[in-house]
Swiss-Prot record:
Main location class: secreted
PANTHER family assigned to the protein according to its UniProt record, in alphabetical order: COL_CUTICLE_N DOMAIN-CONTAINING PROTEIN-RELATED, COLLAGEN ALPHA
Pfam families: C4, Collagen
Compositionally biased spans, kind Gly residues: 29-38
Composition bias type Basic and acidic residues, residue spans: 344-353
Compositionally biased residues, Pro residues: 164-173, 230-242, 376-385
Posttranslational mods: Prolines at the third position of the tripeptide repeating unit (G-X-Y) are hydroxylated in some or all of the chains. Type IV collagens contain numerous cysteine residues which are involved in inter- and intramolecular disulfide bonding. 12 of these, located in the NC1 domain, are conserved in all known type IV collagens.
Protein name: Collagen alpha-4(IV) chain
Length: 623
């Protein structure tokens, strides 16, 4: 609450209160500023004698003294440094054969070996995208619109196929369905685009057009004419009867993220928080103004020398040099002085022979001697172990092996198989809406240079055309993420699989297990790689091709639902289109191996798809 008013003064002082508790230890005070110079104090008592002064500096070197008394017998001196190397003496007589010398020091480390060849690609790991979350409960279906009125005109005759009609008017928007009962979930990131729906049924055949004028008869066939101008749009026909119910569409993917909602209302005030911890001591305040000089204090009582510790005084000033003292006893040998070197003294008397010294430490290792003369040839050594089996004849048989990496990196040939060339993995071509397939196990599927349209077409009039029709090429794809827009120019490079053609000692074949186990190679054959059983493929216009199941091209090292991409030759772009399909051999469960009907299934998770695809292995016979 607020502070109360000051109370009235008491008439008399009360009794003294009880003794308070000792206060908490205060924080260390800050250093105060230097005070003003005080008045000179009273002369103190005589202090204790000071410490002995520090030794004075060295005096100048004295004059050379007279000859001293011969000293005591000295200790044997240290071994001197080895003298300089003597001159080369005359060659001595050949000595007897020496003892076998010690083992030499280990030699220097050998050079690093050459880089090994790239190993075969391992099996695909499990680093796929996790399974999608559970699907919410579908909302209530909206009301069905009223059917249109039936047409009045009778059906017309079947005419020639007319030009594509104009797009119809948009129909009225149906009423919105009721809100679903499922709780609202979090909106994930936009999913990949869904598959393209099935093509709709053909429209009714138009009326036959008028007959054209008769053409003139020429000797030579003319060039194809220019494209005609599109005719005027025909009148809209009467509405037709309602069609049959369509095939249910595929499950749609998650929609795109919706817009951000409006900010919510302000929440209620929270409860008051707990009291905070005690704060740190504040910074020192500013220095206050200098106070007035204080009064001179009274002289203090005489000091008690026993109660006060004696503080040693400062070293005294060096006193005057005293008189020269008497000659003292010979002291211990001092350290060498810094004066000038004196004159050499007279030679002393020869001392007695010293006691033989202790054996000195072994000397340093001498220099390496000169190389000896070559010895006589030794006896022949024992016969060595037989060497490993050779690689066979000095040439291969001319069989070709094609490897497709399904990445943007060139694959390495197996050990012992030289590489002939590298390139890009061509799957098939489409011209005049007809497909021409390439077996991925043959060398023709590895083109050295990539092009979205690697061919032209020619006619009997000696004229060739390039990039004037909607021709296409299809290539094995790499592991890059699916792009949202068609790729062009340098954007295409990371999406095309690389390949290599190698020379093999024998023909390679593929074996398929039709289950999840890796099939073994035949006896006396070795493995080149393992993979998944790739059967066939289709693209635009239901055109495509397939792989022979004995060909190595039917065993791709990695499984992908979209293993190839389409390149539009004329536009120079590539993309993964929704009408591209890949077909794979599947696993056959043991309970369905006796001519039983398969059960339909839809697999959306990558791991479940891999478990359904047959495994395979490519083998080659030992040479």
């Amino acid at each position: 609450g607020p502070k109360g008013n000051k109370g009235d003064a008491a008439s008399q002082f009360g009794p003294p209160g009880p003794k308070g508790e000792p206060g908490s230890r205060g924080y260390q005070g800050h250093f105060g500023g230097p005070g003003e110079q005080g008045f000179p104090g009273v002369q103190g008592h005589r202090g204790p004698p000071g410490r002995p002064g520090s030794p004075g500096s060295s005096g100048p070197p004295g004059c050379p003294g007279g000859q001293g008394i011969p000293g005591l017998e000295g200790h044997p001196g240290e071994v001197g440094d080895p003298g300089p190397r003597g001159l080369l003496g005359d060659p001595g007589r050949p000595g007897p054969p020496g003892m076998k010398g010690p083992s030499g020091s280990p030699g220097l480390d050998g050079l690093h070996g050459l880089k090994g060849q790239k190993g075969t690609k391992g099996a695909s790991g499990l680093h796929e995208m996790g399974p999608p979350g559970p699907m919410g409960i579908p909302g209530i279906k909206g009301d069905k619109g009223e059917p249109g009125s039936p047409g009045i005109s009778p059906p017309g005759l079947f005419g020639e196929r007319g030009p594509p009609g104009l797009p119809g008017r948009p129909g009225p928007v149906g009423p919105m369905g009721a809100t679903g009962r499922a709780p609202k979930g979090d909106i994930p990131d936009p999913g990949p685009p869904g598959d393209q729906g099935l093509p709709g049924p053909d429209g009714p055949r138009g009326a036959p057009g008028p007959a054209g004028p008769p053409g003139s008869v020429d000797l030579l066939k003319g060039e194809p004419g220019d494209c005609g101008v599109p005719g005027p749009p025909g009148p809209p026909g009467p509405p037709g009867p309602p069609g049959c119910q369509g095939v249910p569409g595929c499950d749609g993917h998650d929609g795109q993220k919706g817009p951000m909602g409006f900010p919510g209302l302000q929440g209620p005030h929270g409860l008051p928080g707990l009291p905070g911890e005690k704060g740190l001591p504040g910074s020192p305040g500013r220095k206050g103004p200098t106070g007035p000089p204080g009064y001179r204090g009274e002289p203090g009582p005489p000091a008690d020398e026993d109660s006060c510790p004696r503080i040693p005084g400062l070293p005294g000033v060096p006193g005057p040099r005293g008189p020269e003292g008497a000659m003292g006893f010979p002291g211990q040998r001092g350290p060498p002085g810094q004066g000038c070197k004196g004159e050499p003294g007279l030679d002393g008397k020869r001392g007695r022979d010293g006691v033989p010294g202790a054996p000195g430490p072994p000397g340093h290792k001498g220099d390496t001697g000169e190389a000896g003369r070559p010895g006589a040839p030794g006896p022949p050594g024992p016969t060595g172990d037989p060497g490993p089996k050779g690689l066979g004849p000095g040439y291969l048989s001319g069989f070709l092996l094609v490897l497709h990496s399904q990445t943007d990196q060139e694959p390495a040939c197996p050990m012992g198989m030289p590489r002939l060339w590298t390139g890009y993995s061509l799957l098939y071509l489409e011209g005049q809406e007809k497909a021409h397939n390439q077996d991925l196990g043959l060398a023709g599927s590895c083109l050295p240079i990539f092009s979205t349209l690697p061919f032209a077409y020619c006619n009997i009039h000696q004229v060739c055309h390039y990039a004037q029709r909607n021709d296409k090429s299809y290539w094995l794809a790499s592991a890059g993420p699916l792009p949202m827009m068609p790729l062009s120019e340098e954007e295409i490079r990371p999406y095309i699989s690389r390949c290599a053609v190698c020379e093999a000692p024998a023909q390679a074949v593929a074996v398929h297990s039709q289950d999840q186990s890796i099939p073994p190679c035949p006896r006396a054959w070795r493995s080149l790689w393992i993979g998944y059983s790739f059967l066939m493929h289709t693209g635009a216009g239901d055109q495509g091709g397939g792989q022979a199941l004995m060909s190595p091209g039917s065993c791709l090292e990695d499984f992908r639902a979209a293993p190839f991409l389409e390149c539009q030759g004329r536009q120079g772009t590539c993309h993964f289109f929704a009408n591209e399909y890949s077909f794979w051999l599947t696993t056959v469960p043991p309970d369905l191996q006796v001519f039983s009907a398969p059960s339909p299934d839809t697999l959306k998770e990558s791991q479940a798809q891999r478990q359904k695809i047959s495994r395979c292995q490519v083998c080659v016979k030992y040479s």
